[in-house]
Amino acid sequence: MKRLLIFVIPLLCLLSCEDAKYSLDNRFDPENIDLRPPALFFHPPEILTTIDTSIAIELYGLELEPAAAAHLDIRYDWGSVTVDSVIPGPFFSGQNNPMEITVDEQGVLDIYLYYLPDVQNNQNEGGTWSLATVYFSTISAGESELLYGTNTILRDANNDSVRIKDFGSGYINVK
């Protein structure tokens, strides 16, 4: 009888258990954004907000090759949002913090990011990282499309272009 219980109890526990089913299809995950890597995109791709609000949008790279510098040419509707500030992301961070220069002119935001070399590296390792975070303030109702302009380029330590296959877009909808 004891042998039977030793056999039956674990069998009942085993048969009564059911594996959990998870839905791992977050549309904001880089794997689910429908871009061919290496790519640049905005995260989050869509923001619904109100007037007089501060919002943050990250400029992301998907499976980028190693780079030492970037010129990010960001286009936006300057009638509904204004740029407050730009903070470099971890993509160009090494032992030294990256250098960043920002020029904002009526709907065109030029961001220049530079990896500051150290004794071990003269460029980053590449990968999927945030290149920068842009903070916007909303000033009027409307929709602002975010685009990477034609001047967007990444360079490696030899000043060669880093290939980018695809560019994502973003939207800020101000109610």
Q: What are these model-derived regions, one by one?
A:
Residues M1-C17:
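Sec-dependent bacterial lipoprotein signal peptides
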